Amino acid sequence: MLRRVPWILLLAAGARADAPVAEPSDPAARAWVAQLDMHVLPRESGYLSLIATSAQKAVVGGRALAVQSQVYYMLTRELPANYLHWLASDDTHILIDGGPVDYFIFHPDGRAEKVTLGRDVAAGQVLVVPVPGGCWKALRLHPGAGFALMANALSPEWTPDRVRIGAGEAWIARYRGAAPWATDAFLRELIGPNFTP
């Protein structure tokens, strides 16, 4: 049995609800926003709609959490980046429509990888991106793409105390040079407006 998740959970993370909304220019993206009742995700950016949370529970860190929660998430030309954040939960992204999207994943052991979510499997793109819990990640819509709509499954459920948004110089120093693209300037760009000096 699944239950709807209240939108207020996202606001509990200290996010601002009054951020200006950038309406998508792509007609299909506009239709998805309306049909899925999507809202701009404060701080991380992009559009989000909560689907449900599993009624099954698991004990994690001494407390009972739902085994899984699911959301729709979308990037658009107007909101093409999902800024750097860390999740305690495993976060599996499944492409529904549009794309491609680059995922920049930063592992606790210092490794960094780039994975492209898209339909061109022959070119190395993937339809599903599993991001292990405890990793940092940021997403960027490919230039020229109108939007990318994904379904995300978070296991165990998303809770506001199990996410961190943004980073600073120490984080940049840790991942600098971990991949050819991991320059100071690009890592700072992935952090976006959530840079913490």
What label would you give each PLM region?
Residues M1-P6:
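Bacterial N-terminal signal peptides that target proteins for export
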Residues W7-A17:
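Hydrophobic h-region of N-terminal signal peptides that target proteins for export
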Residues P20-V129, A138-L139, A145-G146, P156-T159, ...:
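Non-catalytic, conserved peripheral segments adjacent to functional cores
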